[in-house]
Amino acid sequence: MRKPVGSKDGSGVYSRQGLDGYTPANSNTRISTATLPRPEPLRPAASSANLGLNSDRLRLAMVQRLRQMGITDDRVLDAMAAVPRHTFVDEALASRAYEDAALPIGHSQTISQPWVVARMIAAVCEARAPSRVLEVGAGCGYQAAVLAQFVREVHSIERIRGLYELARANLRALRLSTRVRLIYGDGTQGVPGVAPFDAIVVAAAGLAIPQALLNQLAPGGRLIAPEGSTSQRLVLIERTGTASWKRMELEAVRFVPLKAGIQS
């Protein structure tokens, strides 16, 4: 069992030290939600100890809220209803797992908020049913687990050794390690030996989309990624020819930065 990322000081508040890295600057919480409906907030479980008994109900409530927020792809919604998000975060934060919030997973990284996961996956899957998908930035493994519910071949690359090990343990616990090929490496380079991919999902923001990733899209394939530094937007790119791509800008977001190389 992983150590809790925070500890309560008696007031019910987790310590700043325990939540190191969990700040708006490295959260992928959306900057603006003004255009989205505002459903009733989800009431979290009383404690992580009894969350297992309530997780099915909480996941269904989360999925219903995502539907109210405009996610309509049943493949994505069914997949998110099937994956226990609370098992991908520290026990100290498990009671918040089904809130629409990014949560810290260590190494100054976060698990993406459910709306962002659903939005990004739905966008790249809208035009086709992808059979081979690349995820750049495995993190704790949650998004890869969601993809594995309906995608035949999922490849997920993580540059931080500690997160790679965390994702591997989480996927193994759910018996998904044979359905997700997890790679420790530089995500900006993709996985050229496995390309082309029907879809690529990038879970970190760069100033520009790496050309290596664009080159690894199959014809008609789609890539989605946050782009920018202090001001970021989701960008959806579709490959339309051998050397041509179509680009569309979507919502404002905030993600951790995309970095090259690996971190041991």
From Swiss-Prot:
It is an enzyme of class 2 (transferase). One of its GO terms (molecular function) is protein-L-isoaspartate (D-aspartate) O-methyltransferase activity. It catalyses: [protein]-L-isoaspartate + S-adenosyl-L-methionine = [protein]-L-isoaspartate alpha-methyl ester + S-adenosyl-L-homocysteine. PANTHER family: PROTEIN-L-ISOASPARTATE O-METHYLTRANSFERASE (PTHR11579), PROTEIN-L-ISOASPARTATE(D-ASPARTATE) O-METHYLTRANSFERASE (PTHR11579:SF0). Belongs to the methyltransferase superfamily. L-isoaspartyl/D-aspartyl protein methyltransferase family. The keyword Phosphoprotein does not apply. This is Protein-L-isoaspartate O-methyltransferase. The active site is at S112. HAMAP family: PIMT. One of its GO terms (biological process) is protein modification process. Its EC number is 2.1.1.77. It comes from Bordetella avium (strain 197N). Its main location: cytoplasm.
